[in-house]
């Protein structure tokens, strides 16, 4: 019922100009920007007073599992938003508490008659918003919500797919190709508009409603390094300009070459800014659209140009009506794979102490900076789940949710189900080798040396497998394996073969139960990304991974190929079609698997 109410409100018309002057509150949540903010424009329209509010729960900040890097990014984004509002003779009101407790007080204290906010498609958000809308109605407050966090109306996609979300990217593309183009971004709120509805700003505003510091929220900042990613709309728009400066990749569908620089944070990366709404996905979409038409002389851009944004929409659509999307139990689209419970192995993976330098360097970068390349995410996700440790993807979701700047409910959980072969037509017989993949990407090992300085003196020949280095080399490097750096947590060659066989048996049992054929040729999600244009340069590759994963290498596999898949260079066969099984449809109960 809550979802129904929230969805209905999402399409509520904005009040027309000339409406009796309202006292409006615009509630910022994810859309931390002034550009393309239709809900903010609805708050301003016909209002005598507008206050821009962000509700922050200090108790949640102190007790949640979200890491310090994401909190820092959020606070920087709020500071930037407040700075932009100051230029419009307004301020951001950061109110401490929970929405259900805060709004009744604000409605009375400020005489609020209109509440506006951006529609939230995720299950928790819809439930929260339905409760607030009910509360507002009882208080006589008009509620206006506008959809600007996604390109499409997700409910319409589901309706066109027979009242269920499409569970393959190919099907998703087919649905949206029948829909109208996304709405264009709306204009920026102007100083003249804000001047006509100025709210009174008290002298003690910073003390009462200012953006708190990390220390005020209880985070220890001693030893915290400088932010690699600066939060805020201003930074997001500057990055977008840099992102689009390289016209060649749009014109020629250049596929970026994977190299060591690809693994480092790029100044054109956009994923955290899309996640927090510092950058409008619609602005990004149409800036890409316009640039393509300019370069290609008015040719209509193909869907593949927007691949990263569409992966994001795909996962949002799959999750919008599934509150169990981030867990196995009760999740109708998730195969119930009997994962092992191994807290010790999970902890070593999360802390970067697996004994595989490639995996440990990635997890160290994630913990330090809050971001890793999309293929690095694939590597560590495969290692934790079906590749080596056979630990549930749910554990990976929780770790990424803590550490990733760009993690959100839909994309994070969807990517983990996808990479662990738990949903979305993945191929279980391909594994990332925790030695070979890194070595092909960065033969010199500079990435390892950057994040694992203990190993910096190892020669490149041994830096990806230091346990094979002679004792003399280990001593010369002042790093004895098993003493100064851990031995490998598993034998990858043996474990990956065993796990591929386990996954094969699970799929065969499931196939017999459902009457499906594992060898049936079905459309693969790799077809749509045969031109992965959404990554403009090798240094940018993966910077938008939150907007959706890239497919694993694909192609028919012989028995020998299946056993040797651990050594397959990832990313080299992305444009080939896969032959995979059709996974269970949403009606499959968890117990049946």
From Swiss-Prot:
- Region: Required for inhibition of CLOCK-BMAL1-mediated transcription; residue ranges are 390-489
Query: What residues does the Glycyl lysine isopeptide (Lys-Gly) (interchain with G-Cter in ubiquitin) crosslink join?
Result: 30, 126, 242, 348, 475, 504
Post-translation changes: Phosphorylation on Ser-266 by MAPK is important for the inhibition of CLOCK-BMAL1-mediated transcriptional activity. Phosphorylation by CSKNE requires interaction with PER1 or PER2. Phosphorylated in a circadian manner at Ser-554 and Ser-558 in the suprachiasmatic nucleus (SCN) and liver. Phosphorylation at Ser-558 by DYRK1A promotes subsequent phosphorylation at Ser-554 by GSK3-beta: the two-step phosphorylation at the neighboring Ser residues leads to its proteasomal degradation. Ubiquitinated by the SCF(FBXL3) and SCF(FBXL21) complexes, regulating the balance between degradation and stabilization. The SCF(FBXL3) complex is mainly nuclear and mediates ubiquitination and subsequent degradation of CRY2. In contrast, cytoplasmic SCF(FBXL21) complex-mediated ubiquitination leads to stabilize CRY2 and counteract the activity of the SCF(FBXL3) complex. The SCF(FBXL3) and SCF(FBXL21) complexes probably mediate ubiquitination at different Lys residues. The SCF(FBXL3) complex recognizes and binds CRY2 phosphorylated at Ser-554 and Ser-558.
The free-text note explaining how the cofactor binds reads: Binds 1 FAD per subunit. Only a minority of the protein molecules contain bound FAD. Contrary to the situation in photolyases, the FAD is bound in a shallow, surface-exposed pocket.
Q: What segment(s) does the record annotate as region Disordered?
A: 532-593
Where, by residue number, does FAD bind? 271, 308, 374, 406-408
* Domain Photolyase/cryptochrome alpha/beta span(s) in chain numbering: 22-151
Q: How is its activity regulated?
A: KL001 (N-[3-(9H-carbazol-9-yl)-2-hydroxypropyl]-N-(2-furanylmethyl)-methanesulfonamide) binds to CRY1 and stabilizes it by inhibiting FBXL3- and ubiquitin-dependent degradation of CRY1 resulting in lengthening of the circadian periods.
Low complexity bias locations: 537-548
Disulphide bridges, residue numbers: none
Principal subcellular localization: cytoplasm
Expressing tissues:
Expressed in all tissues examined including fetal brain, fibroblasts, heart, brain, placenta, lung, liver, skeletal muscle, kidney, pancreas, spleen, thymus, prostate, testis, ovary, small intestine, colon and leukocytes. Highest levels in heart and skeletal muscle.
Residues that bear Phosphoserine: 90, 266, 299, 554, 558
Task: State a single Gene Ontology molecular function.
Answer: DNA binding
Q: Which residues form a coiled coil?
A: none
Query: Which UniProt key words apply to this protein?
Result: Biological rhythms, Chromophore, Cytoplasm, FAD, Flavoprotein, Isopeptide bond, Nucleotide-binding, Nucleus, Phosphoprotein, Photoreceptor protein, Receptor, Repressor, Sensory transduction, Transcription, Transcription regulation, Ubl conjugation
Q: Does the keyword Ubl conjugation apply?
A: yes
Name the needed cofactors. FAD; (6R)-5,10-methylene-5,6,7,8-tetrahydrofolate
This protein's GO CC annotations: Cry-Per complex; cytoplasm; cytosol; extracellular region; mitochondrion; nuclear speck; nucleus
Annotated localization? Cytoplasm; Nucleus
Q: Does the keyword Coiled coil apply?
A: no
What is the documented function of this protein? Transcriptional repressor which forms a core component of the circadian clock. The circadian clock, an internal time-keeping system, regulates various physiological processes through the generation of approximately 24 hour circadian rhythms in gene expression, which are translated into rhythms in metabolism and behavior. It is derived from the Latin roots 'circa' (about) and 'diem' (day) and acts as an important regulator of a wide array of physiological functions including metabolism, sleep, body temperature, blood pressure, endocrine, immune, cardiovascular, and renal function.
Family, similarity comment: Belongs to the DNA photolyase class-1 family.
Subunit description: Component of the circadian core oscillator, which includes the CRY proteins, CLOCK or NPAS2, BMAL1 or BMAL2, CSNK1D and/or CSNK1E, TIMELESS, and the PER proteins. Interacts with TIMELESS. Interacts directly with PER1, PER2 and PER3; interaction with PER2 inhibits its ubiquitination and vice versa. Interacts with CLOCK-BMAL1. Interacts with CLOCK. Interacts with BMAL1. Interacts with NFIL3. Interacts with FBXL3. Interacts with FBXL21. FBXL3, PER2 and the cofactor FAD compete for overlapping binding sites. FBXL3 cannot bind CRY2 that interacts already with PER2 or that contains bound FAD.
Q: Under what name is this protein listed?
A: Cryptochrome-2
The gene is CRY2
